[in-house]
From Swiss-Prot:
InterPro entries: Nucleotide-bd_a/b_plait_sf (IPR012677), Ribosomal_uL23-like (IPR013025), Ribosomal_uL23/eL15/eS24_sf (IPR012678). Belongs to the universal ribosomal protein uL23 family. One of the early assembly proteins it binds 23S rRNA. One of the proteins that surrounds the polypeptide exit tunnel on the outside of the ribosome. Forms the main docking site for trigger factor binding to the ribosome. The keyword Ribonucleoprotein applies. The keyword Transcription does not apply. HAMAP family: Ribosomal_uL23_B (MF_01369_B). This is Large ribosomal subunit protein uL23. NCBIfam families: PRK05738.1-3, PRK05738.2-4. GO terms for biological process: translation. GO terms for molecular function: rRNA binding; structural constituent of ribosome. Gene3D superfamilies: 3.30.70.330. Keywords: Ribonucleoprotein, Ribosomal protein, RNA-binding, rRNA-binding. The gene is rplW. Part of the 50S ribosomal subunit. Contacts protein L29, and trigger factor when it is bound to the ribosome.
Length: 98
């Protein structure tokens, strides 16, 4: 797997109330990822970027919501969400910048 592809797989961390609780209690972090990314690619990308050991990866395809503006109806984009579980002694700190 080339490093350029691994850097593109993770788009951004997904922050919500549920994601924050999961990170604090269970060491499970949530990311928005490319729609065509596989579990193996996500695992390798997290291990490569954050220097941690990944325990497991679960993915969910999120359907975009239908939205209306006056008479025009539209749809937000579909996206993929990845739940990454780390080993007990590992942690990711998003506040540190390099």
């Amino acid at each position: 797997m080339n490093a350029e592809r691994l850097m593109m797989v993770l788009r951004e961390p997904h922050t919500s109330e549920k994601a924050t609780v999961m990170a604090d209690k269970f060491k499970q972090f949530t990311f928005k990822v490319l729609k065509n990314a596989t579990k193996t690619e996500i695992k390798l990308a997290v291990e490569h970027i954050f220097n941690v050991k990944v325990k497991s990866v679960s993915v969910v395809n999120v359907k975009g919501k239908s939205k209306r503006f006056k008479q025009t109806s539209g749809k937000r984009s579909d996206w993929k969400k990845a739940f990454v579980s780390l080993h007990a002694d590992q942690d990711i700190d998003f506040t540190v910048t390099e």
